[in-house]
Amino acid sequence: MKLQQLLSYTRRAIDDYQMIEEGDNIAVGISGGKDSLTLLYALHGLKRFYPKKFDLQAITVDLGYEGFDLSGVTKLCEELEVPYTVVKTDIGKIIFQDRKESSPCSLCAKMRKGALNERVKELGCNKVAYAHHMDDIVETMILSMLFEGRFYSFSPKTYLDRMELTVIRPLMYVKEADVIGFKNKYNLPVVKSPCKVDGYTKRQYAKKLVAQLNREHPGAKDRMFRAILNGNIKGWPEKAIKM
């Protein structure tokens, strides 16, 4: 996927759900993976011509694992002239050594988001951008149906009352295959996750299930995504731009 196509998908999502307003200070949550680095590129590119002016910075929560080398990400942020903050934590140690969690993902995500949002507020940002793409939204819906018995997926835009922060997901119209293509084309400095359960989670199961359904029923993933968009899910804002 070329940058221009990425910017088109990103702007469409932002306009559809009014994700960005004049004067916003937006922090991009950077895990070091392909998705978050693609989002950084997209918002940096959009910032140059989007009619509503906004500031942009990047932030990573370091879980404390050995070998988590962010030098490539640091260099990229310097090249893009985007301020970059790394939050050092012991979350990995707390999860696996202190608490010895057998199913760590939920607690880890909660602690990571807490650390991220706290620093985002300290940096003076009013919005935080997460790099969830179309596949993530569909997979979350599958997980919610299988394990919670409800039709749900996370919203394009969510206001966190307690933190007085708005979460936005500008990559919601971008497919993971396109993110992979963008990563390869632009040689993004992806940092491999050092987490010991990476690739062995319920989300990975959902990813394989969706891929299988899409192979057996071509277009199934797109149809599931449309069902989510049209599903009147609680907490989802209405689209500002009607098609």
Predicted regions and their residues:
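ATP-dependent adenylation/nucleotidyltransferase module used to activate substrates
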Residues: M1-E139, F147, A177-K185
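Electropositive phosphate-/nucleotide-binding environments in soluble metabolic enzymes
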Residues: Q4, L37, G67, K110, ...
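Solvent-exposed amphipathic alpha-helical surface segments
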Residues: Y17, L46, Y50, L213-E216, ...
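Catalytic subdomain that performs nucleotidyl-dependent activation
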Residues: L56, D136-R215
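Residue-level detector of flexible, active-site-proximal loop/helix-junction positions
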Residues: Y65, I91-K93, T158, V174, ...
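Short, solvent-exposed polar/charged micro-motifs at secondary-structure junctions
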Residues: I95-D98, K202-Q204, I233-W236
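A short, charged, Gly/Pro-tolerant segment at domain boundaries
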Residues: R215, G219-M243
